[in-house]
Amino acid sequence: MTIALGKFTKDEKDLFDIMDDWLRRDRFVFVGWSGLLLFPCAYFAVGGWFTGTTFVTSWYTHGLASSYLEGCNFLTAAVSTPANSLAHSLLLLWGPEAQGDFTRWCQLGGLWTFVALHGAFGLIGFMLRQFELARSVQLRPYNAIAFSGPIAVFVSVFLIYPLGQSGWFFAPSFGVAAIFRFILFFQGFHNWTLNPFHMMGVAGVLGAALLCAIHGATVENTLFEDGDGANTFRAFNPTQAEETYSMVTANRFWSQIFGVAFSNKRWLHFFMLFVPVTGLWMSALGVVGLALNLRAYDFVSQEIRAAEDPEFETFYTKNILLNEGIRAWMAAQDQPHENLIFPEEVLPRGNAL
């Protein structure tokens, strides 16, 4: 018996190999296997948003005008959430609510679930695209890991939070002014700005912006080989092949400024990755907590003292009153189906009033 040792090679390519060759071919815009998820989902999400903001009203779900057709502009148009009565229905076009009627589907808010779900899978497809390309060119997958931060925020805010509440109605609608309304809602009903997870998110995002500005300025400041132009801007060449800045000079500069400085590029760039991604993940965790109506930082002793002593008031107690005002004024308008009526005497007023 003869045993042949060696690598097995197929004589003919099967369908998988043919698809793999075509999908991963070197072209101007890489497609890849991830593109099978990314491109259709991104196309439908963006297309659904443009369709909704252009033509579709929110009269039947929120009692609002929300399209260019009704007179909104770019800042006030939105694809709004379904009515609260529809709870967590996927609102499929062929489902029991719309029954295949496209106009009725739009009126019920079906475009919101369409955009939200295709948007989520589109973002996941983009992260998989970064994994796939990193694998192809033998890079580590830190870009994809970093992009998990925005995905975590999107999924927690647009999907997990409303799943914890009574329906998609309480998710943000897809529009600029609609997001502002949602932020006010979060503050009034959850005191979100005093939540430690929100604080970590703000520190991460603003800290990352600061690090980015400092890093870019420092690299530009420490270039030691450049063009021969008469001024900085003519001498600067963005297509320079190799890096010609001095890490040693940058280290000395910041050591003199702060007393401490990054000693190598790896630690510096890891820190620039760690700060924003951790901030985004922490804020996403905080929103998951809000989905379960968890409370954070209720300083009850100050509230009791403020209620008993007309001369005692803190910024915290003033903010609590503002939150009560947001709830009282917003709930009646934002949830008309609840028929909430607040008489004047129960509306909150601070000690100064």
From Swiss-Prot:
Please give the Pfam families that the UniProt record associates with this protein: Photo_RC
Q: What is the catalytic activity of this protein?
A: 2 a plastoquinone + 4 hnu + 2 H2O = 2 a plastoquinol + O2
Q: Which keywords, in A-to-Z order, does the entry hold?
A: Acetylation, Chlorophyll, Chloroplast, Chromophore, Electron transport, Iron, Magnesium, Membrane, Metal-binding, Oxidoreductase, Phosphoprotein, Photosynthesis, Photosystem II, Plastid, Thylakoid, Transmembrane, Transmembrane helix, Transport
GO MF, one term, reads: chlorophyll binding
Query: Any stretches that span the bilayer, and where are they?
Result: 41-61, 125-141, 153-166, 208-228, 279-295
List modified residues, type Phosphothreonine: 2
InterPro entries, A to Z = D1/D2, Photo_II_D1/D2_sf, Photo_RC_L/M, Photo_RC_L/M_CS, PSII_PsbD/D2
Q: How does it sit in the membrane?
A: Multi-pass membrane protein
Which GO BP terms, alphabetically?
photosynthetic electron transport in photosystem II
Specify which residues bind Fe cation according to the UniProt entry for this protein. Answer: 215, 269
Q: Where in the cell is it found?
A: Plastid, Chloroplast thylakoid membrane
Give me the comment on cofactor binding.
The D1/D2 heterodimer binds P680, chlorophylls that are the primary electron donor of PSII, and subsequent electron acceptors. It shares a non-heme iron and each subunit binds pheophytin, quinone, additional chlorophylls, carotenoids and lipids. There is also a Cl(-1) ion associated with D1 and D2, which is required for oxygen evolution. The PSII complex binds additional chlorophylls, carotenoids and specific lipids.
Q: Which residues bind a plastoquinone?
A: 215, 262
- What is the similarity comment for this entry? Belongs to the reaction center PufL/M/PsbA/D family.
Give the protein's recorded name. Answer: Photosystem II D2 protein
**Annotated organism of origin:** Jasminum nudiflorum (Winter jasmine)
Gene name of the encoded protein: psbD
